[in-house]
Swiss-Prot record:
EC primary class: hydrolase
Enzyme Commission number, as recorded: 3.2.2.22
Record carries keyword Hydrolase: yes
Disulfide bridge map: 34-258, 84-105
Glycosylated residues (UniProt): 10
InterPro entries with a match to the protein in the record: Ribosome-inact_prot_sf (IPR036041), Ribosome_inactivat_1/2 (IPR017989), Ribosome_inactivat_prot (IPR001574), Ribosome_inactivat_prot_CS (IPR017988), Ribosome_inactivat_prot_sub1 (IPR016138), Ribosome_inactivat_prot_sub2 (IPR016139)
SUPFAM superfamilies in the record: Ribosome inactivating proteins (RIP)
Protein name: Ribosome-inactivating protein PD-L3/PD-L4
GO molecular function list: rRNA N-glycosylase activity; toxin activity
GO BP: any one term: negative regulation of translation
Entries under Pfam families matching the protein: RIP
Keywords associated with the record: Disulfide bond, Glycoprotein, Hydrolase, Plant defense, Protein synthesis inhibitor, Toxin
Its biological purpose: Inhibits protein synthesis. Does not cleave supercoiled pBR322 dsDNA.
């Protein structure tokens, strides 16, 4: 399993762009593309996981473990009292849990568990963060940097603190890798905090559906219109691959052939 490192504490727009490119290249199936957009592999391709190590300005780190075939965050690790401390979402199966534990913290003599006692769904994370929508949780490099420091090496923290970190990290890492539009939102707002707009949320919620629609398109036309949201919350109807292609980073895995260019 390979580790992609991102120095959040010394980040620039270019370094973030390079991080995104590295993550996409590490995760994608080198043989799959639809309309020029790279696709994630099916769940059998090894390595099955990707690690993303985030470092803050004071060199504290948190390592996220992503399932390669869909970029879902399964858990994370930090260094606590000189030991590798691992945290796993409670909706991860026992088989995968063992994988997470052994991948994040390979040394069984120097590790300890601090469970995430809730699941990885956005609705749950929002609830734990005390918001009705993740549009209320600001994203940004400084926020990610300070969130790392609230968890890494800290003995106790609230579910709220942890869920806020996870909402920020999942969107700035996994969602930004899936969607160039989200990566570009981070870059456009690089030196300030920002609230994810309705288009960001709409893309996040429809990634599977969008991937399927692009995969099944005929000569660039979708077989049925996709109804999404614009940044200003108006309805966005997508009829052709070209209309959404600039926003895409990676497609979710869909079996069967598609038009590659």
């Amino acid at each position: 399993v390979n580790t992609i490192t991102f120095d959040v504490g010394n980040a620039t727009i270019n370094k973030y762009a390079t991080f995104m490119e590295s993550l996409r290249n590490e995760a994608k199936d080198p043989t799959l593309k639809c309309y020029g957009i790279p696709m994630l592999p099916d769940s059998n391709l090894t390595p099955k996981y990707v690690l993303v190590k985030l470092q803050d300005a004071s060199s504290k780190t948190i390592t996220l473990m992503l399932r390669r075939n869909n970029l879902y965050v399964m858990g994370y690790s930090d260094l606590y009292n000189g030991k590798c401390r691992y945290h796993i979402f409670n909706d991860i199966s026992s088989t995968e849990s063992t994988d997470v534990e052994n991948t994040l913290c390979p040394n069984s003599n120097s590790r300890e568990k601090k469970a995430i006692n809730y699941n990885s769904q956005y609705s749950t994370l929002q609830n734990k963060a005390g918001v009705s929508s993740r549009s209320q949780v600001q994203l940004g490099i400084q926020i990610l940097n300070s969130d790392i420091g609230k968890i890494s090496g800290v003995s106790t923290f609230t579910d709220k603190t942890e869920a806020e970190f996870l909402l920020v990290a999942i969107q700035m890492v996994s969602e930004a890798a899936r969607f160039k539009y989200i990566e570009n939102q981070v870059k456009t707002n690089f030196n300030r905090a920002f609230n994810p707009n309705p288009k960001v949320l709409s893309l996040e919620e429809n990634w599977g559906k969008i991937s399927l629609a692009i995969h099944n398109a005929k000569n660039g036309a979708l077989t049925s219109p996709l109804e999404l949201k614009n940044a200003d919350d108006t309805k966005w109807i997508v009829l052709r691959v070209d209309e959404i292609k600039p926003d895409m980073g990676l497609l979710n895995y869909v079996s069967g052939t598609c038009q590659t260019t």
